[in-house]
Amino acid sequence: MNAQETKQYLLQKETIDPQAQPIIHYANSSAKLAPTAAYPQGFPSGLLGNQASSKEVASVVSFEALGRTWKSSEYLYMLARWSTNDPANVAIQEDILSASSGYVIKRYKQPKHKRFTRPDFLDWRHEWMLWVVWQKCLSSAGFRNLLLATGDATIVEVVRLDPVWAAWPDENGCYVGANGMGKILMLCREALRTNSAPAIDTDKLNAAGIYILGERVQF
């Protein structure tokens, strides 16, 4: 799958039948599924999500990228909304980083600064999210192990009003939506298994000119 095919895959709406395939799902950072041999207290599927932060399990959700430690992938992902080379955006990014959790970022910080979001952000948000999650995979052994422990299951983020990143069960119990986060996790899982890397359109990301805390990110 090349970068263009990867983008098409991430955008494509799907209907996922849990009766036809094994499913690993999560709706929030505290979600747990049935116990397994490796996870006798219940498989912590919620730790797969972006909003799971270091207050849950730091060894799984925190990671290194761009020369610093991130409490969760939600922090780094969100900074790109305000990532032009503008001192005002550095102030916004620092405000985002002051949030106590990924939930606080999404619920309170994002709406506060929404009007300053880069107008081109939606053009490359999937590529950026894939890059962020892949950095997490490369940096965090705990997260890698958790992701690989999902086996061959289809991973689904379950959110009612987010058909881009998640999916929601219909009247037949099938999950409907693009499930972008679930797909990104599965792409990274496959890359880890095959000792490769997901197909990320780094040319698009470089062309966007993404600045994090005043430094341009080179891909």
Task: State the predicted function of each range.
Residues 1-219:
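Charged, low-complexity intrinsically disordered segments
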